[in-house]
Amino acid sequence: MKKVRFWAVLAIGFMSVMSIKAQGQRMNEFQNEFSKYQTQYRELMHSGKHKEAMAPLASCIAMLDTTTIFKVSPIPEAAILEQKGLLYYDYACCYALVGQKKQALAALEQSVLLGYKDYNNMVNDNDLRSLRKDKKYQALLAQVNDRQPLSVLKKSAPYAKDAARQDILFRYQPKESKNLRMVRDYFKLDSVAGQGDELSKIINLLHFAHDNIRHDGGNQAFAELDAIDLYNYYKTTGKGVNCRQLAISLCEMYLSMGIPARYVTCMPADSLDYECHVINTVWSEQLQKWLYIDPTMDAWVTDENGTMLSIAEVRERLINDQPLVLCETANWNHESQQTKEYYLETYMAKNLYYFVCKKLNRFNPESLYRNNDPADDVRLIPVGFVNNNWKCDTTTDPEVFWAKPKKEQ
């Protein structure tokens, strides 16, 4: 059981909000008390005192039952309830470890009712091994299996033509604009891209961004959102940038080389899941299609014949159980290799439910400090999908959303 990770999710969430929003004394008091119980729980579990570890668990659940902290913070009430489900899962493990099977199953049922969805953890968790032959456990496991990202993606509704949104137009800043010339010259991208064909240039630029700007999903870089500032932020502080900032950086590099590109926010179906991933879609004149490019993982995807695929094609092939080949270079910060089973079939399957892009793709698209109005967003969603977390122009038409880039006149 990944107890430390489950507890850390809530604690880190509150700490992040406090550091950014400085919500005041009440937030501090809540986090300090929660951290106290967290420490007690970890120490008791580490020493094998499973029965005693249930007391701090109960205290944390009671805190979540009575708190109204969500009213003074950006944390939604539903997210707090989801975290309570994780605590009930830990409760189930404690009961199972002390031989109280009935109570363990009741706690596990409560966890599943609150939305627990980590199937791989549940099926492999040795803390629950005494429950595995029980019919109730098996029924709960089946419910959790239905929540697996690939299962959810396969049940998504289809897309549909959208005659009302044919006016949506994506634009790409010309490479000779002053700021993009600055990006190209600063990074010496003509040399980085090399003298090979278009696909080799696209991949070389991907490797360059991945190798020279570290990823840190938990860090919101204190910098302007452009490739030069983000690169210098990392080089100066040693702190990585998040996936959105990394994808913005690579998008500017492609645009500066005259290669149409967007950064794409890949979103999950679950409105309570605030974890998403941001990658790039890059236009290939050579293949006459968009390509799936992920600078966080130094990744692209091909079919069984070695042809590079688009984001739309990766999504479709996941749904239809068609072959997908993850490139051999796929890795996180050169520290952990990525596998198709986890990266594509689990992580990206969760985050390929719907997509958001900017209409205007340019240098510094989301300025924090400059007088630079943000471009409008566009969503691509399946028919009938309802999620108000991202309010912007919306279409169900993939031909509109993934339209071939038009050359600037």
Spans of features found by a protein language model:
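Low-complexity, Gly/Ser/Thr/Pro-rich intrinsically disordered linker/tail segments
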Residues: 319-409
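Bacterial Sec-dependent N-terminal signal peptides
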Residues: 1-27
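Hydrophobic/aromatic-rich core segments of domains that either
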Residues: 248-322
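Flexible helix-coil transition and linker loops at the boundaries of alpha-helical arrays
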Residues: 25-28, 63-81
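Secondary-structure boundary elements
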Residues: 156-241
